[in-house]
Amino acid sequence: MSGLRKTSIALMRRSTSSTTILPHSGGVGGAVSPPSSGVGVATEIEKSIAMQRLRTGESSNPKKLNVSQQPVTSVATTRTTASSLPAETTSSPAAAVRPYSEVPGPYPLPLIGNSWRFAPLIGTYKISDLDKVMNELHVNYGKMAKVGGLIGHPDLLFVFDGDEIRNIFKKEEAMPHRPSMPSLRHYKGDLRRDFFGDVAGLIGVHGPKWEAFRQEVQHILLQPQTAKKYIPPLNDIASEFMGRIELMRDEKDELPANFLHELYKWALESVGRVSLDTRLGCLSPEGSEEAQQIIEAINTFFWAVPELELRMPLWRIYPTKAYRSFVKALDQFTAICMKNIGKTMDKADADEARGLSKSEADISIVERIVRKTGNRKLAAILALDLFLVGVDTTSVAASSTIYQLAKNPDKQKKLFDELQKVFPHREADINQNVLEQMPYLRACVKETLRMRPVVIANGRSLQSDAVINGYHVPKGTHVIFPHLVVSNDPAYFPEPKRFLPERWLKQSTDAAGCPHANQKIHPFVSLPFGFGRRMCVGRRFAEIELHTLLAKIFRKYKVSYNSGEFVYRVNSTYIPQSPLNFKLTLRDE
């Protein structure tokens, strides 16, 4: 590694040019000051290559490098025009299609390409700062940027244009491929094939196996009526968590700084109840050691994935620290979850043998799948997937929404007025009728996930050649849709830094006074749950969990936050690293 570092540093120091000009094909505004941190600083080797290209006439439209020091919510405006052309010709006639080699982006160094950018010590692209990296790519290169030359990984093509994102999604096949996670595919398909076999689930899986699995489960998971059957037990868990919140408040009425960890417990308890008809004991005063182990395993998994997928894949040669942590976390997670899944299946068998009838809310997702398919293995793998992705994501979404409402008391007051109308008192239960009468709460969640999506980007792995933004893009390229950047682009959302739930309330009295309430929102720039056949299958359950808990919190408390602006980091999900010591002041009835 030391030799690699010396080589990279030597290459970066070779040029003494001070000009910062790069070829650029996107439409970006004026230059901004360079950042104070190392993220986004152009290397000397890039300057040298750019000048050489300029002198030889390779670029007919050079532009000055714009390096952003702005927060991710302030991005260059991207012009977009509607297009009715299919994805193969989304931007230009065939005669004007430019080769893939001309797609703008950071230049790869000899031998090590762009992999060095993600390397420790010498790299300028920190994994925890991927939000800033994507913002910088947009500012520097416009509508599209290619990060190629990643050793052991396909090229990453970042698309910052809503119309192009729409065209790619609309073109996708019956079995769309997300950018794969080789580490998870290796775990399921090689390392633990004796357990998973041909039933690998939905996460990190593609092709016929994914298609067959989804066909078996989607009709149960995606039906609105299925999710609504679990409103009563999810209400009970939220009420129990509210009691825990009351005990957590200190003498200043503030929650502990690690309140996000408490939200993990609430989300895990909710997933356990829906998936297995089991209470895991996460919210009990004495706690649950197994629940804590599940949470820690999930957190480790989400930390390890970008370490394995974005850095040089040395784990394929020898077991790196991140790889060992990844495998250990998944093994522990699988073992604990399978123990509880087994108990659920045994109980379901016993209930059936006794002829015991159950209410719809008491039939777990696992039991529904077994009844429909007769495949216990399929039901177990689905439950594992729901546990793996249903805890961290929902918890982070809840924390971000609480923060936005705490920092915008006028919006919180508007929400409270809505809640007062549907809640007879602050301890009232939530049912389907109540949830359907809270459009402003739903808009608050939508606006939060626009500003701070839990998953900052989605993507597809091209299964055939395509033309994107006027460039030929070859099969196998990983196309990334950076929704965090695009949904904070003023071209799509005027005043993107402002928390305006009214944007989502068309033709409603609740939208009165919002200057952007009647704006037509591009349907492909804010997709917090994904799109199409690979959309999150647990979306309806997650929304019920979120809306139920948030309604209870803001009906009972006035929430404020006095610890500055939330700071986020990328840990697979977009997670706040600021303390969550919200102040909760009890409201009058």
Swiss-Prot record:
Region Disordered, annotated ranges: 56-90
Biased composition (Low complexity): 72-84
Subcellular location: Endoplasmic reticulum membrane; Microsome membrane
Documented EC number(s): 1.14.-.-
Any one annotated GO CC term: endoplasmic reticulum membrane
SUPFAM superfamilies registered for this protein in UniProt: Cytochrome P450 (SSF48264)
Coiled coil: none
Record-linked InterPro entries: CYP11_CYP27_families, Cyt_P450, Cyt_P450_CS, Cyt_P450_E_grp-I, Cyt_P450_sf
Binding site for heme: C536
Cofactor: heme
Highest taxon of the lineage: Eukaryota
Polar residues bias spans: 57-71
Chief localization: endoplasmic reticulum
Membrane topology: Peripheral membrane protein
Family as reported in the entry's similarity comment: Belongs to the cytochrome P450 family.
Function summary: May be involved in the metabolism of insect hormones and in the breakdown of synthetic insecticides.
Protein known as: Probable cytochrome P450 49a1
